[in-house]
């Protein structure tokens, strides 16, 4: 997201501060927060992060939500000639990204940039190694508690072993401790399992 947004803004000759109308694809709050962080927008930016009210409230048939955001940003740019709009869309598991810059004032000297240049930077980024069969102690990176009939049933836990490897696991006991106080960074133990890895508090 960071690389793509920076490229789109650079090609338009604009900075984040020069954007007047902003819409970030809003399938889930995490998608909006991650995009804002990568683009350089505050979560409470006074310009707002949606032009429609957001996908959960505005809707949009099928995969068509961002078309409505584009239509809205075009209308706003036309009503304020010279203003600039930005629409970010994503798909997959936050793995496919689209960036659009809109204005009534065309960028001067615009030229296409080969996306392979940006792909080189993306390919050079480091990420933790992943293990499908974790064993040992580590810490929680993030989690989601699954509820059944209003009660916590189990949790998906993404963690990092002490050796740095990332893992995916399930937790079934001690779920209140995930909900009642901050859990990110807390210590857990994990054992490989079939069909799922199991995490527990230490």
Annotate each language-model stretch with its function:
Residues 1-12, 69-73:
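Short, well-ordered amphipathic alpha-helical segments that serve as non-catalytic structural scaffolds
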Residues 1-6, 26, 32, 38:
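Acidic, glycine-rich loop-and-beta core segments that form the ion-binding/anion-interacting portion
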Residues 4, 38-69:
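Conserved catalytic cysteine-centered active-site region
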Residues 10-17, 39-48, 76-81, 107-109:
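Secondary-structure transition/capping motifs at alpha-helix termini
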Residues 10-15, 20-24, 58-64:
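Extended C-terminal subregions enriched in glycine
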Residues 16-24, 45-53, 80-90:
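Beta-strand segments within the central parallel beta-sheet cores of soluble alpha/beta enzyme folds
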Residues 30-31, 58-202:
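Conserved beta-strand-centric core segments of catalytic alpha/beta enzyme folds
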Residues 36-39, 155:
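Flexible domain-boundary/linker segments
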